[in-house]
Amino acid sequence: MLGEDDESRVVRVGGGIELRFHELARAYPDIVDDPVLDFLVTARSELVSVEVSVRTLDGDGLDVFLAELAEDFRGWEGLRTWRSLEGDLTLSARHSGRSVYLTWGLHDRPPSEEWRFEVTTAHAPGEDMRNLADEISLFLESEPRP
C-alpha cells in the first residue's frame, strides 16, 4: 500500500509483520546527479521492531526485479534473489504455483554483521506483484528528502 507519511512517500508490505519503505534521501545531495540513494526499511509488529538503513545506486533495480517477478506470473523453478549495494537489504522469491513468497532480509552492515532479520510475505502472482513493483518504483522515483 502506497501512502504519504510525514510528507514523504511510504510503501507498506505484508500483513502480520509490516515492512515500511520510507525516508528516501540522496547520500551526497551536493553532488549533481548523485546516484547513491538511501532509504529506511522498518519491520514492525506487536512483537518486533527492526529498522535498517539501505544504500543503493538508484535503487539497485529493486523495482525491475519485482516487475520481472510479476511478468513471470505463471511461475519459475527455484529461488530468484536480489540484494542492495551493501547487502543491508536482500530479497528472495519463490513461486509455489498459487502464490509468490518474498523473503525480505534486513541485515546489519559489514564489518560487524552481528544480526539479521527475515520475514516472508505472500502475494498473488500477476497483478498483486505488479502493484508492488509499481509502488516500489514510485517510491524510488519520488523526490528524495534534502
PLM feature segments, named:
Residues M1-V48, V54-R55, F139-P146:
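Charged, alpha-helix-forming regions
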Residues V32-D34, V48-L62, V119-R130:
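Short, low-complexity cationic-aromatic patches
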Residues R74-L89, S142-P146:
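Short glycine-rich, low-complexity/disordered patches
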Residues V13-G14, R20-L24, T42-R44, S53-L57, ...:
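A structural detector for beta-sheet-dominated domains
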Residues R109-P146:
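Mixed-charge, glycine-accented linear interaction segment located at domain edges/termini
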Residues D33-D38, T81, L89-E113:
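Intrinsic, low-complexity N-terminal interaction/targeting segments
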